[in-house]
C-alpha cells in the first residue's frame, strides 16, 4: 500500500485498514502516538496558516523558492489570489510539467520560508532516527570515521558547525510548524531535545 493510502485511512480513523500493511512493532508506536494526540498529522490542518503565508509573498519572493522557474512564481501568485483552499490551489497551479507532488513541495517550502540558498546536493550531517544492537556495531566506528557528523541526540545538533547548524535550525523550525498539524498541538523545540529510538533485543 502507498503512503498516501495509509495516511488517508489513518485520517478516517480506519486503524484496522492499516494493520495488515505495517509491522506490529510500528503499529504499537503508531497507536501510542494517536492516543497521546501526536498523530495522525494532516496538511489540511495547516490550510489557513499556509494560505496566509502565501498571501504575504510577492512573485519576486516566490521566485526564490526551490524548484520555481520559468515564470511559475506568477502562476502561483495568481492562483493564491483566486483560491480559498489548498486543493483548489494545487489544482489551479498544476500543469503537465508541474505535477501535484512538485507543486505541494513548493507550497510547503513557501510556508517554511525555505529559499534556494538551502538547496545542497549533500547533507551537512546525518541524523539517526533509530537503531538496534546491529546498528550499535555499525554506528560506533562510523561516528569516529564518517566524513559527516552523525547526530543521535537533539543535543548533538547544538555542536554542529555554523553551516550545518543553520540547516538544523531550519529543520527544527519545520518540526515546530509541522507539530501544529497534529490533533494536539505540540510545544516548540522538540527537535533539539529528542533522541533516536533504540530497539533492544
Residue ranges of each PLM-predicted region?
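Active-site cores that bind ATP or allylic diphosphates and position pyrophosphate for catalysis
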Residues: 1-201
Amino acid at each position: 500500500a502507498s503512503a498516501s493510502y495509509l495516511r488517508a485511512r489513518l485520517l478516517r480513523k480506519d486503524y484496522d485498514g492499516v494493520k495488515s500493511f505495517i509491522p506490529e512493532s510500528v503499529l504499537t508506536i503508531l497507536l501510542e502516538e494517536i492516543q497521546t494526540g501526536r498523530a495522525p498529522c494532516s496538511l489540511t490542518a495547516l490550510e489557513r496558516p499556509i494560505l496566509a503565508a502565501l498571501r504575504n509573498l510577492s512573485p519576486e519572493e516566490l521566485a526564490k523558492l526551490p524548484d520555481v522557474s520559468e515564470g511559475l512564481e506568477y502562476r502561483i501568485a495568481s492562483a493564491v489570489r483566486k483560491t480559498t483552499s489548498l486543493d483548489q490551489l494545487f489544482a489551479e497551479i498544476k500543469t503537465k510539467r508541474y505535477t501535484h507532488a512538485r507543486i505541494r513541495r513548493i507550497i510547503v517550502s513557501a510556508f517554511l520560508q525555505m529559499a534556494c540558498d538551502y538547496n545542497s546536493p549533500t547533507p551537512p550531517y546525518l541524523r539517526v532516527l533509530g537503531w538496534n544492537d546491529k546498528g550499535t556495531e555499525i554506528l560506533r566506528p562510523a561516528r569516529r570515521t564518517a566524513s559527516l557528523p552523525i547526530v543521535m541526540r537533539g543535543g548533538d545538533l547544538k555542536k554542529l558547525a555554523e553551516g550545518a547548524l543553520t540547516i538544523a535550525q531550519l529543520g527544527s523550525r519545520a518540526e515546530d510548524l509541522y507539530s501544529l498539524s497534529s490533533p494536539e498541538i505540540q510545544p516548540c523545540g522538540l527537535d533539539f531535545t529528542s533522541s533516536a529510538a533504540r530497539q533492544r533485543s
